[in-house]
């Protein structure tokens, strides 16, 4: 599989940005190492362009008639190789060359048909969709692997998704032009599409993993046989006798949750919290939304069950950097061959200024979905998060967005990044 053409641009006028993007992908499509006949486009726009979503899709699809399938969404920020766009009008595009029988675009009005055997799926969703968590779990069950990746659209204006399949519109969507609001959409992939995906956490535990002994709905009343509020105050070393200090610390604290089945029986802290002191990829970070002093209970923004593991945590930039570098290194080590020809070694060893995507990395393209609360500003500077990805993963075609919640496996995460790469093995 050859490298996927990709591009990104910013401009106050969407037509100018689209023109810049089209020029970039067309220039790549004539290069030997890049795919020349892609049929699937992944399109992400910032919310500055949300009101023009239909016009953007119509224009790009008319300019790229050979690309018959489109998927994507809107974000308060978008990402590409080595760059992030926040609070400015921008778009990014990647063109994927995959066997036509190995992927299907779907949406709420044109769901995935029974005739396609999905192995995994890229999912975009609207956070306002009723029973969203259940829909994500149901979609995961539709795949052989049970693995989804993607995120929730994030926007300060219109929350839109792109989904166009086949020669024009998806069969069944009627007069809809490929821009949707609400529900789920995305791309399902067959088993011959090589994908490697990892979740990177952004929070650091500040307590051991506790066992939830008693809980009702989103209220936990007992941890390890003790009142949950007492455990929280002890772990954070604060007291309600000094309410201002206690509330300030608690507001900066979140909880990491793991279900018993995912925690291998919940027998050990090392399951939810690894030997490095970081959360495992199955831990879901949620907000503390209230305290109940009368019942000595803690309320969180998710449903709780007895037997779950719960650890208190806080956002930590250094831990987030280290974990992001770790997942990039894991993917790189898994895909790069042990022996490379001299030409490839020279290309991969090029300086950052001279670097360019190369097939020898084993990566045809990548999708990165990060939390809208992460990104460069959180990591210390403009585009800092994507610069970390480039240094650790290498120079690869990449697009993505900053989401209102990240999807991996059958879960909805927060404060994480989900990095997925298309391997360049032949389908």
Show where each model-derived region lies:
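Charged helix-capping and loop-helix junction motifs
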Residues: 382-385
């Amino acid at each position: 599989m050859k490298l996927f053409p990709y591009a990104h641009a910013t401009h106050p006028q969407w037509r100018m940005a689209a023109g810049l993007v089209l020029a970039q992908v067309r220039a790549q499509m004539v290069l030997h190492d890049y795919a020349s006949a892609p049929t699937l486009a992944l399109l992400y726009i910032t919310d500055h362009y949300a009101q023009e979503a239909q016009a953007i899709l119509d224009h790009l699809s008319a300019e790229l008639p050979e690309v018959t399938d489109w998927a994507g969404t809107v974000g308060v920020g978008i990402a590409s190789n080595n760059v992030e766009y926040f609070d400015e009008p921008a778009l990014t595009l990647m063109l994927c060359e995959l066997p036509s029988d190995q992927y299907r675009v779907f949406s709420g009005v044109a769901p995935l048909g029974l005739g396609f055997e999905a192995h995994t799926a890229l999912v975009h969703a609207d956070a306002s969709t009723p029973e969203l968590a259940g829909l994500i779990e149901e979609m995961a069950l539709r795949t052989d692997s049970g693995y989804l990746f993607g995120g929730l659209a994030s926007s300060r204006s219109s929350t839109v998704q792109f989904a166009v399949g086949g020669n024009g519109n998806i069969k069944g969507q009627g007069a809809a032009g490929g821009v949707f609001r609400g529900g789920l959409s995305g791309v399902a992939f067959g088993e011959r599409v090589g994908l490697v995906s990892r979740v990177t956490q952004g929070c650091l535990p500040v307590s051991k993993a506790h066992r939830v002994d008693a809980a009702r709905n989103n209220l936990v009343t007992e941890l390890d046989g003790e009142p949950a509020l007492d455990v929280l105050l002890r772990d954070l070393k604060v007291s309600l006798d000094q309410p201002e200090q206690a509330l300030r610390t608690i507001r900066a604290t979140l909880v990491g949750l793991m279900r018993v089945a995912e925690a291998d029986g919940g027998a050990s802290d090392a399951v939810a919290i690894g030997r490095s002191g970081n959360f495992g990829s199955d831990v879901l970070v949620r907000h503390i939304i209230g305290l109940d002093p009368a019942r000595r209970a803690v309320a969180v923004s998710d449903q709780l069950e007895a037997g779950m593991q719960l650890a208190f945590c806080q956002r930590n930039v250094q831990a987030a950097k280290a974990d992001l570098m770790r997942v990039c290194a894991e993917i790189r080590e898994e895909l790069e061959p042990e022996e490379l020809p001299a030409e490839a070694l020279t290309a991969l060893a090029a300086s950052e200024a001279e670097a360019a995507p190369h097939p020898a990395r084993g990566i045809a393209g990548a999708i990165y979905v990060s939390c809208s609360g992460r990104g460069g500003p959180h990591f210390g500077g403009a585009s800092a998060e994507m610069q970390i990805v480039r240094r650790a993963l290498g120079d690869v075609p990449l697009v993505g967005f900053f989401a209102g919640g990240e999807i991996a496996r059958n879960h909805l995460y927060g404060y994480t990044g989900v990095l997925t790469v298309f391997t360049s093995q032949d389908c």
